[in-house]
């Protein structure tokens, strides 16, 4: 302990040289720092063989554990992670107290391995996830016990096992509390200028386990210390219970965390809608960069497929909970979730899914599709930073007008030669050559019934261009051909597209395919308008100026019902669905006439007449889109 005291004395002497501050960074400085970083993404990390954070930091078994860390961080590097949230808190403090020099050496070694694999540390010091005093013991090095089959390796955890109880921590012990602060001071001082530290997450979930009245004073004390040391990295404490407009959390401790933080670290384990609402609420309230330092709860609907692209789209940093499944067992549900099953509070909760974690002990993914999404989104964000992303390519020649999430996928809106256009990117790796789909009209209608989201999930980008004012006359054809040329030459899409034509979109698709058969691979038509007979002049736009003298469009060679042979000549297969009771676009003079002529010309056409259907709804039930998807993805 004399050596520890000597080290701490040196630390205290060093801190007196620092230029202290007494408030959070300005918002401008916070954003300047954040914008200088790549998109932050990673996980909360503990080696799979560690039963808890005592195991993570203690001498016992450390050599084997560091070999494991090397393998696991190499795995994290392959999927594009660049940050790890590592918790020291009171379990690490228990090691620091007994094995001070060894702890500091192992902390340094951890940072070095992380840097080797291109990752930086988010370091957690305080923690309010705790259990009542009656069962609390000071964490100590040695063999760590754990219960098999329980979240966190404990039968009785801080996650709902003690409702109403106040958690107990080392900061409640008058002898241990000063020593805990010394540990924090030593780490903050030693690494205040170290680029391997991304930021200091000073407190995990302040106010959890009913500790808010106790934590406010401690939280302020730790921030005051950190301000005196003034590291070059930002400081943050977690807001972890954001609900709707409650962007300050639900306790004084959380509100204080937001008020003291340079950047906002928050936790959200909710579904896509809740994630979106949380981001909006936090941005509106705090106006600072956001990092969701805990997410991924499949049982709650917090999925990689939806949340991860959302964070990227909104430039919100994120670290999921868990990496390789191990002794800590956070892939298991909370015990309270099992109780909800047995008492029928949440009988439909999918508790057989993994709750957290990404990889199995074998290092095979829990779900390979999740890892593909993570890799793809990471690559997209890195490419964007380098000016090589799809969005960046679009921005070279077009004005970006907006970005959003469209059915869980990133959509970039832009102007193409004065017309509204957008491209939706798949989150997974695109198919070789980037095959794609194009809804030519009504691109926002009946989307989940058209198979488009399913095709995005398979790696097919989706696009549209607004040419409705032309009703696909010669000007519309030219505009679409120029748009496709842009997509192929500038964005790397394959030469031939898969067209989706609902109602007016059927008119557009067939005319385009007949004019540019070399540009079209397949067409899915749904209740298509293929003939103007029965339409008034107001509906057909510029076509009214060239209407047949007798008003009969069926014989007009420009009508799609008369273009079937040209489409067949282009060897373009067609899937045609229509309603037998369609009063808007009568089948006899549209779908059925086209189908008959298409077949007569020797074309490949799959027709389904749905006798009880009218013009709407287009598409098929969302759980029956396989027919459309298979049609588009079939090789020939």
Where are the regions a protein language model picked out?
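Primarily recognizes the serine-hydrolase "nucleophile elbow" in alpha/beta-hydrolase
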Residues: 496-548
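C-terminal catalytic histidine-bearing segment of alpha/beta-hydrolase fold enzymes
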Residues: 327-346, 351-353, 358-363, 367-371, ...
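Alpha/beta-hydrolase active-site loop
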Residues: 178-182, 471-492, 511
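Short amphipathic alpha-helix adjacent to the substrate-entry channel of hydrolases
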Residues: 446-463
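Active-site mouth of glycoside hydrolases
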Residues: 22-261, 285, 295, 299, ...
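A domain-start/cap signature at the N-terminus of enzymes
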Residues: 386-430, 541-543
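The feature captures the conserved acid-bearing segment of alpha/beta-hydrolase catalytic domains
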Residues: 275-282, 533-540, 544-599
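Gly/Ser-rich "nucleophile elbow"/oxyanion-hole loop immediately N-terminal to the catalytic nucleophile
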Residues: 166, 192-197, 481-503, 514-520
């Amino acid at each position: 302990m004399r050596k520890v005291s000597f080290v701490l004395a040196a630390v205290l002497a060093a801190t007196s040289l620092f230029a202290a501050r007494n408030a959070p960074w300005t918002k401008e400085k916070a954003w300047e720092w954040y914008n200088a970083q790549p998109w932050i993404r990673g996980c909360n990390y503990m080696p799979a063989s560690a039963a808890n954070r005592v195991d993570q930091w203690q001498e016992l078994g450390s050599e084997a554990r560091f070999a494991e860390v090397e393998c696991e961080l190499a795995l994290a590097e392959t999927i594009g992670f660049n940050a790890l949230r590592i918790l020291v808190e009171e379990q690490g403090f228990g090691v620091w107290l007994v094995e001070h020099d060894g702890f500091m050496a192992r902390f340094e070694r951890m940072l070095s391995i992380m840097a080797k694999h291109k990752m930086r540390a988010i370091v957690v010091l305080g923690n309010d996830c705790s259990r009542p005093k009656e069962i609390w013991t000071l964490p100590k090095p040695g063999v760590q016990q754990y219960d098999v089959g329980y979240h966190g390796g404990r039968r009785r955890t801080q996650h709902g096992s003690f409702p109403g109880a106040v958690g107990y921590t080392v900061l409640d012990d008058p002898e241990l509390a000063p020593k805990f602060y010394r540990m924090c001071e030593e780490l903050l001082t030693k690494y205040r200028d170290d680029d391997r530290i991304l930021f200091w997450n000073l407190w995990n979930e302040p106010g959890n386990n009913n500790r808010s009245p106790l934590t406010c004073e401690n939280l302020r004390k730790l921030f005051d210390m950190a301000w005196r040391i003034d590291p070059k990295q930002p400081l943050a404490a977690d807001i972890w219970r954001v609900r709707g407009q409650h962007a300050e959390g639900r306790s004084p401790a959380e509100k204080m965390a937001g008020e003291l933080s340079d950047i906002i670290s928050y936790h959200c384990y909710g579904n896509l809608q809740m994630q979106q609402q949380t981001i909006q609420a936090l941005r509106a309230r705090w106006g600072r960069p956001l990092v969701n330092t805990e997410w991924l709860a499949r049982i709650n609907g917090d999925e990689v497929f939806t949340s991860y692209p959302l964070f990227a789209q909104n430039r919100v940093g994120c670290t999921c909970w868990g990496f390789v499944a191990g002794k800590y067992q956070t892939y298991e549900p909370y015990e309270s979730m099992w109780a909800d099953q047995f008492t029928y509070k949440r009988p439909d909760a999918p508790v057989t899914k993994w709750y957290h974690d990404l990889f199995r002990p074998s290092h095979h993914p829990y779900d390979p599709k999740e890892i593909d999404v993570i890799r793809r989104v990471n690559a997209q964000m890195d490419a964007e930073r380098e000016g090589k992303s799809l969005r960046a390519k679009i921005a070279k020649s077009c004005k970006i007008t907006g970005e959003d999430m469209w059915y869980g996928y990133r959509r970039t809106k832009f102007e193409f030669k004065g017309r509204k256009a957008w491209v939706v990117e798949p989150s997974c790796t695109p198919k070789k050559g980037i095959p794609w789909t194009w809804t030519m009209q009504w691109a926002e209608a009946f989307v989940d019934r058209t198979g488009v989201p399913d095709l995005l999930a398979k790696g097919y980008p989706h696009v549209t261009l607004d040419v409705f004012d032309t009703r696909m006359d010669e000007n519309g054809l030219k505009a679409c051909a120029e748009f496709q040329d842009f997509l192929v030459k500038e964005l790397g899409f394959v030469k031939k597209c898969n067209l989706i034509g609902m109602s007016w979109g059927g008119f557009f698709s067939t005319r385009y395919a007949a004019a540019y058969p070399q540009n079209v691979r397949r067409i899915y038509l749904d209740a298509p308008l293929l003939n103007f007979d029965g339409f008034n002049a107001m509906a057909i736009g510029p076509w009214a100026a060239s209407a047949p003298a007798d008003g009969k469009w069926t014989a007009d060679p420009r009508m799609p019902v008369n273009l079937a042979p040209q489409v067949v000549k282009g060897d373009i297969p067609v899937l045609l669905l229509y309603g037998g009771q369609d009063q808007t676009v009568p089948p006899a003079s549209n779908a059925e006439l086209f189908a008959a002529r298409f077949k007569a010309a020797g074309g490949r056409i799959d027709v389904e007449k749905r006798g009880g259907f009218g013009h709407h709804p287009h598409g098929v039930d969302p759980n029956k889109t396989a027919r459309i998807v298979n049609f588009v993805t079939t090789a020939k």
